[in-house]
Design a protein with these regions (language model features):
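Glycine/Thr-rich phosphate-binding loops of Rossmann-like dinucleotide-binding domains
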Residues: 20, 57, 84, 130, ...
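Cap/insert and terminal regions of metallo-dependent hydrolase folds
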Residues: 38-40, 46, 73-75, 79-82, ...
Length: 260
């Protein structure tokens, strides 16, 4: 997502690669083109990364952003800064030129907007991390709350349903908009501890007290899970009809704009 708040341009888990995989010839392949061509991006001020899975952290994309956008800063879960140090040219982990900031759960950082300050909070959800067979849980994972006096936004990252989302709602006091993952949920016996389904996404919106929500994490890479690429929006609409919750939860086309 490209998030624009008070003159700031931020990206969430940017990925312009053709595969969500360590291999160029195998693994989940891109089905849907990015909503914005890379060369059409505005000047990017900051990037937030939710975790290090291959569909969320792409080396070529990160390097291209680091090279093309001077002054960019990456906010990452604790541990991922070491990946930046070894893999991404131009990474600075400390000092006045620092451009990679690692946060623990519950920590926050700030950016100066055009008129007011934007606070970035890194918040725990249930998921996991790994880039290879031997590094599971070595880095953190989580969600991001971008809190501005005029607009409050929550990016879920990947998550399973857990009490964490209720905690986020209580801690942060609610949001104007939440971007909530709705895809990669089948088969449930395998995915339920890692990914919510569309029905659970409705409950997550209620838990975090978001006035509006958009569904993300669907329809982009083929081979991530068992449901068809276009199934998540259909299941979300069905869940909305069956739910007793009154929700404002929509799915945008890739490249479509949501505006407050």
């Amino acid at each position: 997502l490209l998030v624009q708040i008070d003159g700031l341009n931020l990206l969430t888990d940017p990925h312009w690669g053709q595969r969500a995989s360590p291999f160029s010839f195998a693994g989940p392949k891109r089905h849907q083109a990015p909503g914005i061509p890379f060369d059409k991006l505005p000047a990017i001020d900051a990037v937030v990364i939710s975790h290090n899975h291959w569909d969320h952290l792409d080396k070529d994309t990160v390097q291209a952003l680091m090279t093309a956008h001077k002054g960019i800063r990456f906010y990452v879960p604790l541990g991922i800064q070491h990946w930046f140090k070894t893999e991404i040219k131009g990474s600075v982990l400390q000092g006045p030129a620092q451009n990679v900031v690692a946060l623990d759960w519950g920590q926050q950082a700030s950016l100066k907007g055009k008129t007011k300050k934007l606070d970035l909070h890194f918040l725990a959800v249930q998921h996991w991390s790994a880039r290879s067979i031997g590094d599971r849980y070595e880095t953190l994972w989580g969600s991001w709350a971008l809190m501005h006096p005029d607009f409050k936004f929550w990016f879920s990252g990947d998550l399973a349903y857990s009490p964490d989302t209720q905690d986020i709602g209580k801690r942060m006091g609610g949001f104007d908009l939440a971007a909530i993952a709705i895809g990669a949920y089948e088969p449930r016996w395998f995915m339920k501890d890692s990914h919510i389904n569309p029905s659970e996404a409705l409950q997550v919106q209620k838990d975090v007290n978001a006035k509006a929500a958009i569904g993300i994490h669907w329809g982009t890479f083929d081979g991530m899970s068992d449901e068809p690429l276009d199934q998540a929006p259909k299941d979300l609409e069905l869940a909305k009809k069956e739910s007793s919750l009154e929700v404002n939860f929509v799915v945008l086309k890739h490249g479509q704009i949501w505006q407050k």
